[in-house]
Amino acid sequence: KSKIMQHVKFSEYILTTIHRAENVDNEKVLNNIIKGIIGAKTPTIISLHPRTKKMLEKFSMIKKLENCKHVQIINPQGYLDFLALIKNSRFVMTDSGGIQEEITSPLLSKRVLVLRESSERPEAINAGMASLIPLRHQNITKSILQEWDKKEVKIKKSPYGTGNSASKILTVLEKYS
């Protein structure tokens, strides 16, 4: 059972992950993301990938985040703890393709702001579960605030299925064994 929520300092928050080379290795883009997060002034948990931490330190940006009262930096979490963080978040902001798929599952059903110019997961975007965010700090701040201010988000059916793939596979295997 996950105990990660005992360490979360916000009752409501945005869960954020950033790790893609095109975002973290580019000083201008990384600065835009950080400025966008800080500018929104919304409670944000950043699961800080080692590569991202290294680049934040290299570009002298880590202190900006550490000194921001509405940002909580945490180390990367195991799968179950990360699922608990997603489940308890208002929404997720990420550049991760895998997370874009995970959050649309029927068990999580969260919206995601995608910190990229394009995505290999157009199904999530077409289903209204994900939105691409242009990587300019004003766009990031505006998108965060718009998503945060939504009172009730109508989540559509997951474009990746209903979460019962394992039972369907088992049925087929049993039928032909």
Q: Where would I find each of the regions flagged by the language model?
A:
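Nucleotide-activated sugar donor-binding and catalytic core shared by glycosyltransferases
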Residues: K1-T42, T52-S177
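Short loop-to-beta-strand entry elements in the cores of soluble alpha/beta enzymes
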Residues: T44-I46
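Conserved C-terminal portion of the radical SAM core fold
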Residues: H49
